[in-house]
Amino acid sequence: MARADGRSDDALREVRITRGYQDWPAGSVLVEFGRTRVLCAASVQEGVPRWRAGSGLGWVTAEYAMLPSSTNTRSARESVKGRIGGRTHEISRLVGRSLRACIDLAALGENTIALDCDVIQADGGTRTAAITGAYVALADAITWLSAAGRLTDPKPLSCSIAAVSVGVVDGRVRLDLPYEEDSRAEVDMNVVATDHGTLVEVQGTGEGATFTRSTMDKMIDFALAGCSELSRIQSEALAAPYPGELPGGAA
């Protein structure tokens, strides 16, 4: 069965990365995977969590949330409910540890970079879009910190990080699932990888069926190829000058 949007099984949706979407954070990005849109902001904060104080190491943390109207049925804000849901906690932790995989925390000194990922519109793959966009916001925050003279190493990023969903739908392995496919997938997987082709995290579940080792291998092959293309798109976005004003008027 053909995909509703006409893509081949191994094709990404149209991906757009817009840097400098907000004026105030050190890094901000609007990332779009098809109709999924996520605003990713990287804010620099002096100091680190209490358990890390005195270590000389920095920290990178993340918070993920969905706007009430990001889906076709409005959901109440978790702040109004009085508790953060398990899914939100899980994805926030995933984004944070994915981005920590690419950075030398010692180079930050005792500074924290907080990544806020807010889903404006959800059509599948929000967590993978958040990771992909958050890396670009993080890279811009590193540029800002470097201009401010607050890094002990001018190049603390060892690689880029991207993520994509992959699954089995209608018996076929498919890349970058929109909601229409994700909601009926027999197998669902999220893959986080570096631009070197190494894996950061793999989350896979047989939602409606078990799956074979050969199917898993094909899914990971599709995902790594997709992450490679996403890394290229990230690199193109970051090739342009820093989109805001740097400390000290640096260009």
Curated annotation (Swiss-Prot):
Pfam families: RNase_PH (PF01138), RNase_PH_C (PF03725). It comes from the Bacteria. GO terms for molecular function: 3'-5'-RNA exonuclease activity; tRNA binding; tRNA nucleotidyltransferase activity. It catalyses: tRNA(n+1) + phosphate = tRNA(n) + a ribonucleoside 5'-diphosphate. The keyword Nucleotidyltransferase applies. Phosphate binds at residues 87, 125-127. GO terms for biological process: rRNA catabolic process; rRNA processing; tRNA processing. Keywords: Nucleotidyltransferase, RNA-binding, rRNA processing, Transferase, tRNA processing, tRNA-binding. Homohexameric ring arranged as a trimer of dimers. NCBIfam families: RNasePH. This is Ribonuclease PH.
